[in-house]
Amino acid sequence: PVLEEIELRLTWQPNDEMPLVDRIAKIGRALIGLKEVEYFGEAKEGRLRDRMKGLIDRLLIPLEEKYHGAAKDGPVVPRVKNLRSAILPDMVKGKVDDAERALRWRQLADVYLAQQLSCYPPDYLAERPSVTRILEIVERFEEDTSDKVRKHGQLKAVLEVGEAIEVSPDRDRNAEVDPL
């Protein structure tokens, strides 16, 4: 029923005859396409990985240039963390007027979207995905389109711990990326 609900929100007819992984991929393409229309004015073509990177950069680079003076490179989560650290302080201290506060809320929403996008590995459903992977994607779609999450069953995790690594106790908390 989750995929059907998402399809209905997209104003589609539910398509339960389509193979499950193909159906999930089609919904994923539609969701990124909607965001591309919102931010670029049109849906893009090409590999999903490139489209996601393009949208993430469209969301983050203008804000990085504004708040840090230049675009950053590297993993999305540290970039998002740095932007939030730049956007929030004056809001919290009440140093912005209503118009600036509204603008910054929009910027925080854009940063959140970039982080959401980065949580979707582009090849996650390739090559006969496990039931767990399929469930993870469907649950993520549900959460990202409705802000609600239902429990759909139990998940299993296997945690393998490798050899210990030496870490300096003098960690630089202002570093842009985690040195590990």
Predicted regions and their residues:
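Membrane-interfacial terminal anchoring regions of lipid-handling membrane enzymes
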Residues: P1-L180
